[in-house]
């Protein structure tokens, strides 16, 4: 899932940091948004080491969240799945697509007490320390808070296949023309010129504007969650 290269990371990060794009979203969410939010949402943000995409489904008091981290250069793609019942975290499941791959699964009971834990690396099962579990819980809290802010701030993730006329066929089958800056379009076109297939793009839309998130040869739509399957 590595996407940005050839120096494309720096302009993206500088633009986001200069405009305080995510900070603006956090401030907007802090002010509160009382209009009804859809139960299934997709969002994301730019991190220091890579892009994060978040899918979330809210049903009654339950929250199901999937976070996908894609590194800019070095590092491994990681998926993190979480479930909450009310405010209580009930599941953490992590997959790191490294060599060898790593899988972590942690469950908590209705009282928030640990009920199951396991780490598996290259087929070898291991136990987790209390410090490791505490770190995973902390990360779960952080991604939940970030997701809350992005959701309230109306930051929407869109993905699809890029076409030569600067339009995208999204994973939902819509044809859109993202309102991206010229440097972002130039970057996509450079990537496309080195690919024999139409590249996939992911971008974010919000009241503050649109930002390119990822470009890759991989078909993002092949594995993207949907409201029915998530």
Annotate each PLM feature.
Residues 2-21:
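Bacterial N-terminal signal peptides that target proteins for export
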Residues 174-191:
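Beta-strand/loop nucleic-acid-binding surfaces
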Residues 206-230:
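OB-fold/S1-family single-stranded nucleic acid-binding modules
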Residues 148-169:
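Structural detector for short beta-strands of small beta-barrel domains
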Residues 36-92, 96-154:
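Extended, compositionally biased repeat/scaffold regions that form elongated interaction surfaces
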Residues 191-211:
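Flexible glycine-rich surface loops and low-complexity tracts that mediate binding to linear polymers
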Residues 32-34:
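Bacterial signal peptide processing site
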Residues 27-30:
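C-terminal motif of bacterial Sec signal peptides marking the signal peptidase cleavage site
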């Amino acid at each position: 899932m590595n996407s940005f290269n050839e120096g494309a990371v720096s302009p993206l990060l500088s633009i986001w940091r200069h405009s305080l794009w995510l900070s603006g979203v956090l401030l907007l969410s802090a002010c509160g948004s009382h209009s009804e939010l859809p139960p299934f949402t997709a969002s994301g943000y730019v991190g220091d080491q890579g892009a994060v995409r978040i899918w979330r489904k809210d049903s009654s008091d339950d929250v199901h969240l999937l976070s996908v981290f894609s590194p800019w250069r070095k590092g491994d793609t990681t998926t993190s799945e979480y479930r909450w019942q009310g405010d209580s975290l009930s599941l953490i499941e992590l997959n790191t697509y490294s060599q060898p791959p790593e899988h972590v699964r942690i469950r908590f009971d209705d009282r928030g007490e640990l009920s199951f834990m396991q780490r598996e690396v290259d087929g070898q099962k291991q136990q987790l320390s209390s410090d490791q579990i505490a770190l995973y819980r902390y990360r779960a809290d952080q991604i939940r808070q970030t997701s809350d802010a992005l959701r309230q701030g109306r930051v929407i993730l869109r993905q699809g296949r890029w076409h030569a006329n600067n339009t995208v066929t999204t994973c939902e089958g819509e044809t859109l023309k993202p309102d991206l800056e010229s440097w972002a379009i130039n970057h996509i076109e450079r990537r496309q010129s080195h690919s024999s297939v139409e590249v996939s793009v992911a971008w974010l839309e919000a009241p503050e504007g649109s930002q390119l998130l990822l470009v890759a040869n991989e078909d993002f739509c092949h594995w993207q969650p949907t409201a029915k399957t998530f």
